[in-house]
Amino acid sequence: MPVNIPPLLPEQLLPIPGLSLGTAEASIKRPGRKDILVITLAENTRVAGVFTRNRFCAAPVTVARSHLTGSLPIRALVINTGNANAGTGQSGIDHAHATCASLARLIGCQTQQVLPFSTGVIMEPLPVEKIITHLPQALANLAPDNWFAAAQAIMTTDIVPKGVSRQIQINGTTVTITGIAKGSGMIHPNMATMLGYIATDAAVTQPLLDDLVRYATDRSFNCVTVDGDTSTNDALILMATGQAGNTPITVSTDPAFISLQAAITEVAALLAQMIVRDGEGATKFITVQVESGKTREECTKVAYAIAHSPLIKTACFASDPNLGRILAAIGYAGIEDLDVNLVQLYLGNILVAEHGGRAASYREEDGQRIMQAPEITIQVKLNRGNASTTVWTCDLSYDYVKINADYRS
């Protein structure tokens, strides 16, 4: 079961003026569940995005990247679950284009103004006719307050829908931010089997929106890992309708931009943490903090060496304080000039190791008590600089194997 995720209620997800969402049931993988989401955007909405760095990226990623960098404003997004349209060659590209073209005809825009997204099984042909046939159904229930249904429609192996809203004041104007995401397995930085859609009604220029999505991603979705597998389909899309009524934000030094950046990053980080908390088979949520490094990059290397380790993740599942595994991971993280005698390792607030070995004050029963909790914090102090980073992961349980062994059945 998900680790400490409060139940999401529809009224918690606030509408964004200028944006509507509609869902449909197309039976792409199985009948009786929402598996198509359409998002329509008002004119003058600005859109920015980041995508997977997997070289075997899916057809919709290729098409979405192309459309997003084109000269025409984006007017709609179409997302399907149950089929990734990845590893499908030219026919996959053709199917992604056909989906965009069909939606464009229905809403009266150009094909290049639609962004396609898919998630599901790889190397199976996209059932494009099912999707096209059910687009009118999705358009028929378009509504600005349909965020909860949208969060349900993009789920695959997720157990719970994921969404969050925040409101901030910018120079006396209320600005709303709402986001949804899906993801449970194949979660790894740059990015993952993760789809995220965040929208705001703030007025902000396109270059700043591009900066915002990259900044938020680096501090959220690129700070999580479930199993170390990088997906073919992941994307994070940030949309700004500009209908809040605030004075348009045009420079990054504007306090309004700093406030908006912090709020969007908070929403992205909460969504990313929900993905880890709902990790396939997860029973524990693990925070890995690495401090006092020379650079953020070396802190990140150490953090991911720990967070990716199957030995550490299974020890967390078993509540086994076999903490030498953490020291080993720090050692193979690739920090060439690391002085291990300076490194300090904490489990929660308990000092576990220092001076190259076990701390004199550490007692195994204290370690086990912390490991038995549903939330575990592992802290590493490199004591060689002022940089730091935080990464979130989960444990590795028997159910992870079962879920993925049964994925296509």
UniProtKB/Swiss-Prot annotation:
Alphabetized UniProt keyword annotations: Acyltransferase, Amino-acid biosynthesis, Arginine biosynthesis, Autocatalytic cleavage, Cytoplasm, Multifunctional enzyme, Transferase
Record has Cytoplasm as a keyword: yes
Subcellular location(s) of the protein: Cytoplasm
Site (Involved in the stabilization of negative charge on the oxyanion by the formation of the oxyanion hole): 119-120
Reaction(s) catalysed (UniProt annotation): N(2)-acetyl-L-ornithine + L-glutamate = N-acetyl-L-glutamate + L-ornithine; L-glutamate + acetyl-CoA = N-acetyl-L-glutamate + CoA + H(+)
Family annotation (Pfam families): ArgJ
Transmembrane segments: none
Residues at the active site: 193
Keyword Cell wall biogenesis/degradation: no
GO molecular function terms noted in the UniProt entry: glutamate N-acetyltransferase activity; L-glutamate N-acetyltransferase activity
GO cellular component: cytoplasm
Lineage: superkingdom: Bacteria
E.C. code: 2.3.1.35, 2.3.1.1
Uppermost EC category: transferase
Pathway(s) the chain acts in: Amino-acid biosynthesis; L-arginine biosynthesis; L-ornithine and N-acetyl-L-glutamate from L-glutamate and N(2)-acetyl-L-ornithine (cyclic): step 1/1; Amino-acid biosynthesis; L-arginine biosynthesis; N(2)-acetyl-L-ornithine from L-glutamate: step 1/4
Any one of the GO BP annotations: L-arginine biosynthetic process
Annotated site residue numbers, Cleavage: 192-193
Record function comment: Catalyzes two activities which are involved in the cyclic version of arginine biosynthesis: the synthesis of N-acetylglutamate from glutamate and acetyl-CoA as the acetyl donor, and of ornithine by transacetylation between N(2)-acetylornithine and glutamate.
Assembly and oligomerization: Heterotetramer of two alpha and two beta chains.
Protein name per the record: Arginine biosynthesis bifunctional protein ArgJ
Organism: Nitrosomonas europaea (strain ATCC 19718 / CIP 103999 / KCTC 2705 / NBRC 14298)
